[in-house]
Regions:
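A short beta-strand micro-motif
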Residues: 2-9
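Short, mixed charged/polar active-site loops
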Residues: 12-14
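Glycine-rich active-site loops that engage anionic ligands at enzyme catalytic sites
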Residues: 17, 21-24, 29-119
Length: 119
């Protein structure tokens, strides 16, 4: 598992996460550093992104707060509403925020520009 940073460029707030061993996470690692722009939905930060390579067998239903996904044209940092996330199918989870970083989510602005890179 590779450790990464997710830096919000306007505030300098940096989140730390670990990528998992999925095909999609390995594809993301090959693209680093990369930048994603998006906004806060109230339960996740959603940024447009090319999906890239992934194994459909590795997709899942639901997320855990702190998960990071890349799929369906989106890069997302999922931070809330885990209990209601069963409505979200075909989630391609590529990593998870470290606990200290999950608590920093509330400090981020509504519109974000994330630069993702190796820690």
């Amino acid at each position: 598992m590779e450790r990464i940073t997710i830096k919000e460029e306007n505030t300098g707030i940096t989140l730390f996460a670990a990528l998992n061993n999925t095909v999609a996470a390995k594809y993301l690692a090959k693209r680093l550093p990369c930048t994603f722009s998006g906004s806060d939905s109230g339960i996740y930060f959603c940024c447009t992104a090319s999906s890239g390579n992934y194994d459909p067998a590795e997709t899942q239903t639901r997320w855990k707060n702190g998960d990071i996904s890349l799929g369906g044209g989106w890069f997302a940092v999922l931070y809330g509403d885990e209990e209601q996330s069963a409505a979200y199918t075909d989630m391609m989870i590529v990593g998870h925020l470290e606990q200290d970083s999950l608590s920093k989510i509330t400090l981020l602005p509504k519109r974000v520009k994330f630069t993702v890179d190796f820690a």
